[in-house]
UniProtKB/Swiss-Prot annotation:
Coiled-coil regions listed: none
A single GO cellular-component term on record: iron-sulfur cluster transfer complex
The name this protein goes by in its record: Co-chaperone protein HscB homolog
Positions of the J domain: 7-79
SUPFAM superfamilies in UniProt: Chaperone J-domain, HSC20 (HSCB), C-terminal oligomerisation domain
One MF term in the entry's GO annotations: ATPase activator activity
The family this protein is said to belong to: Belongs to the HscB family.
PROSITE patterns for this protein: DNAJ_2
GO biological process terms, semicolon-separated: [2Fe-2S] cluster assembly; protein complex oligomerization; protein folding
Cited Pfam families: HSCB_C
Organism expressing this protein natively: Paraburkholderia phymatum (strain DSM 17167 / CIP 108236 / LMG 21445 / STM815) (Burkholderia phymatum)
Gene (name only): hscB
Keywords: Chaperone
Length: 175
């Protein structure tokens, strides 16, 4: 069994890389979870129950991080000593800043016109852009271009926020 301090990848005996076989992650998660689930320790002493709970919590957190591609990228960068710093590093390339403004303007226009179809189309375009950017992110991470990968992660985080905003607007207009 791994240690509580091992990386999420080590916990599930997976290679430390962005490209991940999600079905292998799911299988490894079920295996580890079956070993550490607190129900297995119902008759154990308090100390063993507490340790089992720590393992179960650690396993769930690791799974959630590795299962989500954006969280996995941030985590992988943190293992490499790179802090994405999304909270205080908002500098982005000018072309992406222009794209942000266009997306925001399109959201405002479609929302003001109560045009759910336009919002749906924008969301589809955004998801397509997200797929392209995740492919680029994978290449950056695999090549060790950590600073460029960090920038790509910040951009993807912004895209996720815009997608969530569109979802909120669609929901608001549907009600």
């Amino acid at each position: 069994m791994a240690s509580l301090n091992d990386s999420h990848f080590a916990l599930f005996n997976l290679p430390e890389q962005f490209g991940l076989d999600v079905s292998a992650l799911d299988r490894a998660y079920r295996t580890v979870q079956a070993q550490v689930h607190p129900d297995r320790f119902a008759a154990a002493g308090d100390a063993q129950k507490r340790i089992a709970m720590q393992w179960a919590t650690r396993t769930n957190e690791a799974y959630q991080t590795l299962h989500d591609p954006l969280k996995r990228a941030r985590y992988l960068l943190s293992l490499r000593g790179i802090d994405v710093g999304a909270e205080n590093n908002t500098a982005m390339e000018p072309a992406f800043l222009m794209q942000q403004m266009e997306w925001r303007e399109s959201i405002e226009d479609a929302s003001a016109a109560k045009n759910v179809d336009a919002l749906d189309a924008l969301l589809t375009d955004l998801r397509d852009e997200e797929k392209v950017r995740f492919t680029k992110l994978a290449a950056l991470l695999d090549s060790g271009s950590n600073q460029a990968a960090s920038e790509a992660v910040r951009q993807l985080m912004f895209i996720e926020r815009v997608a969530a905003e569109i979802g909120t607007q669609i929901e608001r207009l549907d009600n």
